[in-house]
Regions:
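Long beta-strand-rich cores associated with HINT superfamily self-processing modules
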Residues: 443, 499-523
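N-terminal lobe/hinge region of extracytoplasmic solute-binding protein
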Residues: 28-77, 108, 183-189
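Structural transition elements
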Residues: 304, 321-355, 372-376
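Alpha-helical secondary-structure segments
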Residues: 100-106, 132-138, 188-189, 217-219, ...
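Ligand-site clamp/hinge motif
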Residues: 178, 207-253, 296, 384, ...
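Surface-exposed binding/hinge segments that line
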Residues: 75, 119-168
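Gly/Pro-rich hinge or "lid" segments in bacterial periplasmic/extracellular proteins
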Residues: 65, 154-215, 219, 346-347, ...
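Extracytoplasmic/peripheral linker and loop segments enriched in polar/acidic and small residues
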Residues: 297-300, 304, 312, 389-404, ...
């Protein structure tokens, strides 16, 4: 570690080591939330914080089973109508009662096109108030994933939003701010008391929460720390209690540190490269008059040039699983028999490029975040070097995740690295978000590479309403194989995500990378 990095680490550790009560959880990771608006950005770190303050009608248990939350019961009135009985006596953090009006309002808000959370109400046509403690969801068709999706349909106070003129979802991609992007009004187990972007979020336990946590955490302090050495130094010095972004080079050392422990676990997140497949010409390339990535042979060449095993061995130090599929183990639809990527083959890649009309390669740009995924910028550096061996001269543009994602949502990236976690643990979520042709609704709502494949579209549309499990899983399998074989994106690997913490911290590792303070105990 350089003197400059060591000094920065010591300074941050000293600031974090201010006296904390025994029931304060000091948690750090490399990436900050994007917003406090629960309907704006489908971003795992943001959702991990938001789930402490906002709640859905249902939630996941410690074992990812759907269980009651703001709804106590649901009944399938018909194939396209589900009645939810709401929990009585629940109050928002300002003391106002939770009612059906808040559910109806939040549904209208999350569906607004400037947000990216509409995927969680996919298939829902309307939410109708029956009475103050009952709502009906009217579906477009039978929706097998309804309950698993509704975990992330966060309910906001209607009266609070109206009072503060924040009934519209924040337009994050255009850098808009609204009252809800900086303030919170939910019913959850914790109140967000302060947020200083890129510095700190503080949360305090909600004494009026309707449920009782299994843990004893009364306060949460979340600190985004981009620098790997600084983040690790904060844990070693006692400045933080838990890290959920471990630098791969430090995992072995931290295992041997007295007073610390490693909580091992995989993550349902796949790291991949997306290419602009829909523009007439691709910006950032020296190919004019056509889309260089539209030729499948070019996509195959770019994929074959990447040595995933080398990235796993060196950059990731074993903390990844090389991938051919766009979903990870633990996601419904994953099949290890389909997930073995072809070995890197530069000679074959060069031949494919020559056959496609690029015997000397071409120039392009690769956009990459540098504070979001494990070793994200280093992975992009690896890929750029591997592409250079086949004559593809890629310029790397790496930046903080906030401007990266804003540019991505404005279709400014010709090729980019992204990681995709599966919040509902079902491959439809991935296929519908990333590969389905983009519409004004949930379909393709994260398809910023302009992928459009009629076969995948047909399969996704069918699986959204298919209630026969075997038939639906066959559709998922076919769509995943089609995505793989047509190289609609280039999967690199599935992340392995151990967490490190002090010995006195007990919590549950979450494959969705969303720690929950309600499951955490500090002794």
């Amino acid at each position: 570690m350089s003197f400059k990095a060591l000094f920065a680490a010591a300074a941050l550790a000293a600031s974090l080591a201010a006296p904390a009560q025994a029931q304060t959880l000091r948690w750090a990771a490399q990436n900050d939330v994007l917003t406090l608006d629960p309907h704006s950005q489908n971003h795992a770190t943001t959702n991990a914080i938001m789930q402490h303050a906002y709640e859905g009608l249902v939630r996941f248990s410690a074992t990812y089973q759907v269980e009651p939350a703001l709804a106590t019961k649901w009944t399938q009135v018909s194939p396209t109508q589900v009645r939810f009985e709401l929990r009585k006596g629940v109050k928002f953090h300002d003391g106002t009662p939770f009612t059906a009006d808040d559910v109806v309002f939040s549904f209208g808000r999350i569906k607004q096109p400037q947000g990216t959370m509409g995927i969680y109400v996919t298939g829902v046509k309307e939410v109708r108030k029956v009475d103050d403690s009952t709502v009906d969801m009217i579906l477009e068709a039978p929706t097998p994933l309804l309950l698993r999706n509704l975990v992330n349909f966060f309910v906001m106070s209607k009266s609070w939003a109206e009072k503060n003129k924040t009934t519209n979802t924040q337009d994050f991609k255009n850098k808009e701010e609204n009252f809800a992007s900086r303030n919170v009004m939910g019913t959850g187990p914790y109140r967000i008391t302060a947020w200083t972007p890129e510095q700190r979020i503080t949360m305090s336990a909600n004494a009026d929460w309707w449920d009782k946590p299994t843990g004893n955490v009364k306060e949460v302090i979340y600190t985004p720390i981009k620098s790997d050495p600084t983040r690790v130094a904060a844990l070693l010095s006692g400045g933080v209690d838990m890290l959920t972004d471990l630098p791969t080079q430090d995992v072995g050392r931290l295992r041997g540190e007295s007073g610390l422990k490693i909580l091992d676990g995989s993550e349902v997140r796949t790291i991949f490269i997306a290419l602009d497949l829909g523009s007439p010409e691709v910006k950032g390339t020296n190919v004019t008059g056509k889309n260089v990535f539209a030729d499948k042979r070019v996509r195959q060449a770019l994929s074959l040039a990447i040595d995933r095993q080398a990235i796993q061995r060196t950059t990731m130090r074993g903390m990844s699983v090389p991938a051919a599929l766009l979903v990870a183990p633990g996601v419904n639809g994953h099949d290890p028999a389909l997930d073995a990527p072809a070995a890197a083959n530069a000679d074959q890649a060069r031949k494919l490029l020559a056959d496609a009309g690029y015997p000397n390669g071409f120039e392009m740009r690769l956009n990459c975040p540098n504070n979001r995924y494990v070793n994200d910028e280093e992975i992009c550096q690896n890929v750029v070097a591997m592409w250079a061996r086949i004559g593809v001269k890629a310029t790397l543009a790496a930046e903080n995740f906030t401007p990266f994602i804003q540019k991505m949502q404005n279709f400014d990236h010709p090729a980019y690295l992204l990681g995709w976690g599966v919040a509902n643990f079902d491959a439809q979520y991935t296929l519908q978000s990333l590969i389905r042709t983009r519409t004004s609704g949930a379909d393709g709502n994260f398809n910023y590479s302009r992928v459009s494949d009629a076969t995948v579209d047909r399969l996704v549309d069918a699986m959204k309403t298919e209630t026969d499990v075997a038939k639906r899983n066959a559709m998922i399998r076919e769509a995943l194989v089609r995505t793989r074989d047509e190289v609609l994106v280039i999967p690199l690997h599935h992340q392995v995500r151990p967490w490190a913490m002090k010995q006195n911290v007990t919590t549950i590792h979450r494959a969705d990378d969303r720690p929950e303070a309600r499951f955490t105990t500090i002794r």
